Every structure is written in C-alpha cells, then in structure tokens.
Amino acid sequence: MRKLFAVFAFLAVFFPAASYAIVPTQEQPIAVVRALDKMTARVEEIELPVGKTVQFGTLSLIAHTCRITLPEETPPESAAYLEIGEVKPGAKDIPVFQGWMFASSPALSAMEHPVYDIWLTGCKDKAAPTK
C-alpha cells in the first residue's frame, strides 16, 4: 500500500501538467445570447458588445469578455464572462448572475430566474456570421 501511495505522490509532484491542457483562445468583440421571457414565450437573439450594457425586459446584460477556441481545436467552444442584473425602479440593480457561460454546455452555469432564461450561443466578430 505504501508503494502505491509513493507512486501516486511521485506522479502528482513531477507530472502535474498531464492532467490538463491549455487551449489557445481568441477574443471576440461580441457575445451572442438567446433570451427567453417565460411569461410571454418571447425568444430573442441578443448581441452584446463587450463592455456595453444591453436591456432585455427588466434585465441588464453586460459581457466582459467573449472567447472562442481556435478553428483547428475540436470541438470548437465559445465562452463569455457575463454579468446580469435585474433593474428595479428607484432601486439599485439586483445581481442575478455573474460568471462564465459556455455555448456547448448551457446548463453548466445556468442563470436562475423565475421570469427569464439567458444562455450563450456563441461569440462573433462584427463581420462574421453568428455561430
């Protein structure tokens, strides 16, 4: 048993990079999200320019960064760091979500809200079509 522990300790100390890989990404100026108003069943695709605030219903959405994996990487992935708040008249914005959203796994970091669903569909350049 001690030999097995020693082998695992050796591997953990001298080969830590074997457990993960750094994937190169490219910054994109626009995050593309899909928004659902559960009360009216309205679905809308919204383009969020990085650093700008966009309104959807009572929500304010800000994309702080949007990144895609390079085209030669498989599978392709889009990820965005989003900040979403609920705007209440005469009060401060109530934070609803702050964190990374991934286009390939929307349930991984979902926004919990009784009226709205927001999920990332991709990132894009101004001239590129939505992915």
Language-model features and meaning:
Residues 2-8, 19-131:
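N- and C-terminal low-complexity/disordered segments
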Residues 9-13:
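Low-complexity, intrinsically disordered tandem-repeat tracts enriched in small/polar residues
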Residues 14-18:
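N-terminal signal peptide c-region/cleavage motif recognized by signal peptidases
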